[in-house]
Amino acid sequence: MKKIGVLTSGGDAPGMNAAIRSVVRTGIYHGLDVVGIRRGYAGLIEGDFYLMDRGSVADIIQRGGTILLSARCEEFKTEEGRQKALKKMKEEGIEGLVVIGGDGSFRGAEKVSKELGIPAIGIPGTIDNDLACTDFTIGFDTAMNTIIDTINKIRDTATSHERTFVVETMGRRSGFLTLMAGLAGGAESILIPEIDFDLDDVSQKLKKGYERGKLHSIILVAEGVGDDFSTNRDINHSKAFVIGKQIAEKTGLETRVIILGHIQRGGSPTAMDRILASRMGSKAVELLLASESNKMVGYVNNKLVTCDISEALSKEKQVEKDVYKLANILSM
């Protein structure tokens, strides 16, 4: 193997640049040419490639986002689109591919490996932390700390005005980010897709808190909670606004709603995300050099591991209900 490609796909996550840096410099260390592919699978189809060197990734380890840019690509989901990508890769001489992204990105990597015959390795980069076969994904720790920092700021004004704040976080199908940020941020209530809840119970808990002398409350809500709430993504009809309105009606408490949105994806990655990305990027290159394909690099029990991408996609990562219980106990 003489030349490999690297791309980022799907939603960006802090630490992706650190992973790109690691792939490029590890590849060069092993005598490989490393080609950067801009805009994910769209760039793969269009041949938007450029040869990277050590200088290409200088001064990026601390930067959020991705220097390779990211985009969603419907065309790659078609056989015709994938054949275009294969033609471009063969013309460029790309013999292996590193894909940094979430589950959608990994489905593409699986197609590259199994259908197109190009070895591909996946690095989990998503703030949702919703991929199986790894304890942590790149970007999760940074996003969690961003939420916690925001909660701290919200508490200041919430206390001053004796208000309840409903704060919506990302997590359409997964509550990992919301749960862990809620536990670390001391949220009074945490609502996630995986665990049923009753707003009457939530409201009673809030009222009891105020009766004990609490001056404010923070309710953290994952964007994918309950079918009983509006699914219209217009900000004025967000589930968080529906929940906030119902809580205000049930409790009589002055309630405000905040949608954190894309702020959770930005910012300089934490040390943990930089280290995780650096280790995973290097491991991905080593796997390609060992003639591995259709594998994902994971991190389990403080060690790097590998698993089949198909296994990571087929398994559903479960939130720890003991952690959810602990968060409820500590918030009482």
Swiss-Prot record:
* MF terms (GO), sorted A to Z: 6-phosphofructokinase activity; AMP binding; ATP binding; fructose-6-phosphate binding; identical protein binding; metal ion binding; monosaccharide binding
Task: Identify the gene encoding this protein.
Answer: pfkA
Q: What is its main location?
A: cytoplasm
> Among its keywords, does the record have Transferase?
yes
Q: Tell me which residues bind substrate.
A: 126-128, 163, 170-172, 223, 256, 262-265
GO biological process terms on file? canonical glycolysis; fructose 1,6-bisphosphate metabolic process; fructose 6-phosphate metabolic process
The similarity comment for this entry is: Belongs to the phosphofructokinase type A (PFKA) family. ATP-dependent PFK group I subfamily. Prokaryotic clade 'B1' sub-subfamily.
Q: Which Pfam families match?
A: PFK
Pathway, per UniProt?
Carbohydrate degradation; glycolysis; D-glyceraldehyde 3-phosphate and glycerone phosphate from D-glucose: step 3/4
Which Gene3D superfamilies has this protein been placed in?
3.40.50.450, Phosphofructokinase domain
Q: What is the lineage of its organism?
A: Bacteria, Bacillati, Bacillota, Clostridia, Halanaerobiales
Q: What does this protein do?
A: Catalyzes the phosphorylation of D-fructose 6-phosphate to fructose 1,6-bisphosphate by ATP, the first committing step of glycolysis.
Against PROSITE patterns, the record matches this protein to: PHOSPHOFRUCTOKINASE
Residues given in the record as Mg(2+) binding sites: 103
The yes or no answer to whether the keyword Cytoplasm is present is yes
Q: Which cofactor does it need?
A: Mg(2+)
Q: Which GO terms describe its cellular component?
A: 6-phosphofructokinase complex
Show the PANTHER family listed in the entry.
ATP-DEPENDENT 6-PHOSPHOFRUCTOKINASE (PTHR13697:SF4), PHOSPHOFRUCTOKINASE (PTHR13697)
Question: What keywords would UniProt list here?
Answer: Allosteric enzyme, ATP-binding, Cytoplasm, Glycolysis, Kinase, Magnesium, Metal-binding, Nucleotide-binding, Transferase
The name under which this protein is listed is ATP-dependent 6-phosphofructokinase
Q: In which organism is this protein found?
A: Halothermothrix orenii (strain H 168 / OCM 544 / DSM 9562)
Query: Could you describe the subunit structure of this protein?
Result: Homotetramer.
Q: Where in the cell is it found?
A: Cytoplasm
The EC class name is transferase
